[in-house]
């Protein structure tokens, strides 16, 4: 009560933000007449003038009013569009690194030009991120006259470009592109063998269009670059054959709320019998159990034409939020292969991850991040918690006059669709356009069948005919048009009204089901009532809809009983609408928890990724190549010598023969400790080995020449890093798969993942060093004839020794890993140990 009274007196936080921006907006308006009086040449001179001001100490905020006024005037002269006052406010929100919620049709594309221009003046680049190549190319083409007039270069990143084209686009002052392209370029750059081949520069400033789609809906989908694994695909066919023989409840149970399926004890026994396995939970059968679970998921939780479609012999994922197909994307962990087996199409090999990153961690690398969308306020808490982004709701330029009717609810889906058809008939008779929203391809085709039976002409827009999207959407606001669409029509499209449609009441939005997220429903509604147009919306629901059936049926049924609703009678009641909204909030909260939980795990991988990528870049720079190599030799020697030389024991008990063998294997050096009498102390032995390795590498440098030796050090180091990083990613995946079970032992799975992940990481760092030095010490330059002789000898040896496995003895490792001088400092500073806590050691 007190809070609501206080809000009325001092206003909401959003009101206070808007008041602050309004003061600056008035400053910009005051400059308009003087800026308009400038010639084209004088306007063009403003860019070098602003850059000079920044160079002499002015901040971006200092020059904002004049810079925005300049962009407004240039927009009027070049693209014949003058930003409204609310668009100036939207631009200020974006400049401050916040999210601007602006309704459909409010001109977000134009809004972005002002903060993009301002932030590009620093010369560090500014990125505008969109959801697809079409929008990236379109927006860059629309707005480039403004930037070009002001002397700034514009680049576009789209799929299919080569590295030279990408490098040129990233070098521009302003770069448009998609989230996928920006993310994959980052991963690809960090797999390259030369800094000159990198395409991207620093991550300075970014505006993410449709920010809720990219940073929330896509947050659970990592970008992955993968290579083929060598596993056979036969197991997927074999396991797929047994799944139809299992029965629900008897052999497995489904939890639709958490989208999980679990085998019962009877089901486990039946699977063991079908697969001729004695114990499915034995360590050697864990892989089989995993693939059985994935096959169960594929058959019970994933529906064709809802979650995916089959096209040209391929299983293609359908994005649940946008309704669009996602060619090239595949489910991981064998799930996609299980779906391919289920649909009897060719099974592609499962891939091994070579590099990956989530959008959450990619976009957090930008010095300043901003976003814009028509629907963000419902997720404001998540934006703040995960990305530290505030949401500011920007008012519309014209008052919103769309009428949003309360939901109408029926007991069965059949009754609901009958009512939907009747309403469409009435609207069609009145020549009023209607956009019907469905949540899946399956439902859009079902409704289309009903409309065809009644003789109503209509268009269907879903992932199966996405190529006709522009044509269908352009006609959707014409008199008498009936358009059925999945979530595809919910974003990035403006539906313009035909002649006299406004007099009929504008475009009517008819939703046939509530989505799990209120944002998706709001996006559908937002297709109508743009820029002060007339319009209306209504949702038709049934208790058989997934959302209500899984999350709200009991509560809503009890409300219906209290109200006294009979069969076939529709319900319109605020209590019901509130119960539905509460169900959506519960699902949103659940999904937020899942994303937050995934981020906690990914943050561990992210810190490791940053260290590895920094090490790669340092090797490629080569600034301290020889110093780092000497440190590496010392660290490897100091790591393994104590395994053979224990100073607590008498020298006669030292394993000097084992040490000689280890030095020979590690460095290709024959050193004789056992016959040299007094071998000295542990430190003496270490110094002797380090000196010998150094001498060997110096001889190689004298033979090869310094340029070739430096090249070999770089290439061998990078190959070792990449090879072991790939294996480490797989090990971390396996660790994450089983870590959840630690909760049953009263341990925090995330803490355990952090601890064991760190141990795996430090072990990988050790192996990278050993591998690099082993290869460097072995490398030789051979004549072509010698190489051919060696190849032939290798072939002969393979034929002679085929089938023989020689087990290498396991090396005993000390329990606590020693921190190497080049390793990341355990204190968490991000610096090398030798330049942090180890500086004085």
From Swiss-Prot:
It comes from the Bacteria. Its EC number is 7.4.2.8. This is Protein translocase subunit SecA. One of its GO terms (molecular function) is ATP binding. ATP binds at residues 87, 105-109, 494. It is an enzyme of class 7 (translocase). Keywords: ATP-binding, Cell inner membrane, Cell membrane, Cytoplasm, Membrane, Metal-binding, Nucleotide-binding, Protein transport, Translocase, Translocation, Transport, Zinc. Gene3D superfamilies: Helical scaffold and wing domains of SecA, P-loop containing nucleotide triphosphate hydrolases, SecA, preprotein cross-linking domain. The gene is secA. Its cofactor is Zn(2+). GO terms for biological process: intracellular protein transmembrane transport; protein import; protein targeting; protein transport by the Sec complex. Its main location: membrane. Monomer and homodimer. Part of the essential Sec protein translocation apparatus which comprises SecA, SecYEG and auxiliary proteins SecDF-YajC and YidC. It is a peripheral membrane protein. It is found in: Cell inner membrane; Cytoplasm. The keyword Cell wall biogenesis/degradation does not apply. Zn(2+) binds at residues 825, 827, 836-837. SUPFAM superfamilies: Helical scaffold and wing domains of SecA, P-loop containing nucleoside triphosphate hydrolases, Pre-protein crosslinking domain of SecA. Belongs to the SecA family. It catalyses: ATP + H2O + cellular proteinSide 1 = ADP + phosphate + cellular proteinSide 2. May bind 1 zinc ion per subunit.
